[in-house]
Amino acid sequence: MRKMMPMNPKQLKKLMKQLDMRQLEGVKEVIIKMEDREIIIKEPIVTVIKAMGEKMYQIAGGSEEEKAIINISEEDIKLVMEQAGVDYETAKKALEETGGDLAEAILRLTDSGVE
């Protein structure tokens, strides 16, 4: 196994300038959206590299979370609102928590006494 020679910060800064690289500061999270799910990377280190007129983003570190995307229609939200007697946001949240299951969302809202 070959060991890498440690690079001093001054050399690293010079190399980054030559490659037109810079680190983005203050990035809290990066979300990669796919058709059926999202990958959420919290507290990442994001580096922007410019090469041949294109920007490339390198994302490293941070904690990763993956969650499925649930498509909830306006009609479903309105139905839950009417049946459970709740506002829009409460109905939407209940549908998200139940994976879009109308009956389960209505039952949770009516059983918990939310008005």
From Swiss-Prot:
Keyword RNA-binding carried by entry: yes
Gene Ontology BP, a term: protein transport
Signal peptide stretch: none
Annotated GO MF terms: RNA binding
InterPro entries associated with the record: NAC-like_UBA, NAC_A/B_dom_sf, NAC_arc, Nas_poly-pep-assoc_cplx_dom, UBA-like_sf
Limits of the NAC-A/B domain: 6-72
Domain of life: Archaea
Record keywords: Protein transport, RNA-binding, Transport
Pfam (any one): NAC
Membrane spanning stretches: none
Disulphide bridges: none
Entry function: Contacts the emerging nascent chain on the ribosome.
Family indicated by similarity: Belongs to the NAC-alpha family.
NCBIfam families (UniProt xref): archaeal-type nascent polypeptide-associated complex protein
Binding partners and assembly: Homodimer. Interacts with the ribosome. Binds ribosomal RNA.
Record protein name field: Nascent polypeptide-associated complex protein
Organism: Pyrococcus horikoshii (strain ATCC 700860 / DSM 12428 / JCM 9974 / NBRC 100139 / OT-3)
Lineage of the species this protein comes from: Archaea, Methanobacteriati, Methanobacteriota, Thermococci, Thermococcales
